[in-house]
Amino acid sequence: MKIKGCKRQSFLDQAVQNGGQPIFYLIKCWDKEESFFKLGITVNNILTRYGTVKAMPYEWQILLELPDTAEAVYDLEVKFKTEMQDYHYKPKISFNGSGTECYTQLSEALQQLI
């Protein structure tokens, strides 16, 4: 399976260049018509990343933040995207990561981390 989104070496380079703390995150997103989960990795603060309506056009809540090495958070993202490929969801309103990182359900392993 090909994992779309941030390429491993690109993310590792970005983490070194920005000097930020790599984080694997899971958020719940919703509005009056939709509810879904979005996972991802970042070296920025999640509140900064999704702090505007343009960046995140849905109501949202952080369910999980796991800071670790760039390699570890990248590998977590790939693992959970693979586990949850059958639950993939494309939200009606587009935002960064909405096409590849949203899901209707969570894997058991991810639920246990929350």
Predicted regions and their residues:
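Non-catalytic accessory segments flanking enzymatic or RNA/DNA-binding domains
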Residues: M1-I114
